[in-house]
């Protein structure tokens, strides 16, 4: 997925799923906490939505807080993720 498409996907998650009224656009230098007012609980929600909506696998052991400092660092992190594989649960 191209970077611009990832940015648009994150914007859609923030505005539609997380219902952040203060977010109208994203710039790579925007800080998630200070500029977009995303707290730690919302960061966890964002990770879940990245997996569900963007279909990227976010391994718990690879989540680095530095990846969630700015929009740009989040996009860098997302570019490194693998596509989420459909898990077939047939017991």
Curated annotation (Swiss-Prot):
Changing residue 40 to A: Loss of phosphopantetheinylation. The modification O-(pantetheine 4'-phosphoryl)serine is found at residue 40. Residues 4-82 form the Carrier domain. Keywords: Phosphopantetheine, Phosphoprotein. The keyword Phosphoprotein applies. Transmembrane segments: none annotated. InterPro entries: ACP-like_sf, PP-bd_ACP. Activated by the transfer of a 4'-phosphopantetheine group from CoA to Ser-40. Pathway: Siderophore biosynthesis; petrobactin biosynthesis. Disruption phenotype: The deletion mutant cannot produce petrobactin on iron-depleted medium. In vitro analysis show that mutants grow to a very limited extent as vegetative cells in iron-depleted medium but are not able to outgrow from spores under the same culture conditions. Belongs to the acyl carrier protein (ACP) family. NCBIfam families: PRK07639.1 (NF005798). Involved in the biosynthesis of petrobactin, a catecholate siderophore that functions in both iron acquisition and virulence. Aryl-carrier protein that activates 3,4-dihydroxybenzoate (3,4-DHBA) prior to its incorporation into petrobactin. This is Acyl carrier protein AsbD. It comes from Bacillus anthracis. The gene is asbD.
